């Protein structure tokens, strides 16, 4: 399975320290959304560390074989993104950087960002949003029936994919 870390979604300029990190599974378009304390590479690596602990090292490697990121400074620590927090000295994934200005390489981004913005309008201070609110948005997006999936949700399809990998 291939994962794409997309742009982080920033809160109110100059007001929000917090940001949202959105991971999209390419095949099913399932989203994993993290609220980060700030817009740094350390915060992104810590989010992947949490995800690896949640899934376990072996399952993480199967589900997140590759991760494509843009060239933002929050993704600068390629080594940190790739290294396992569980199995010291091993890689948990392979990171690729997409070409600058090639938004077609991350086409699902705009749709997901619009969906996020329906729940959290542009200019909102993310510092005031709770983890539960972010999780609720993630569940809403993943439960949304999509024409591209024959009106199945990304969440349903992702669950099927994960079962096959187990």
Regions found by a protein language model. Name each.
Residues 81-91:
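Short, surface-exposed basic-aromatic patches at helix termini and helix-loop junctions that form
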Residues 29-34, 122:
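Short small-residue beta-strand/loop micro-motif enriched in glycine and branched aliphatics
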Residues 7, 23, 29, 48, ...:
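Mobile genetic element proteins and their domesticated derivatives, centered on retroelements
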Residues 92-166:
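Charged alpha-helix within mobile-element recombinases
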Residues 13-19:
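Short, flexible loop/turn motifs enriched in small residues
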Residues 58-77, 100-101:
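Acidic/histidine-rich, metal-coordinating catalytic segments
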Residues 2-5:
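Short, small-residue-biased leader/transition segments that mark boundaries at the very start
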Residues 16, 33-58:
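Active-site beta-loop-alpha junctions of metal-dependent nucleic acid enzymes
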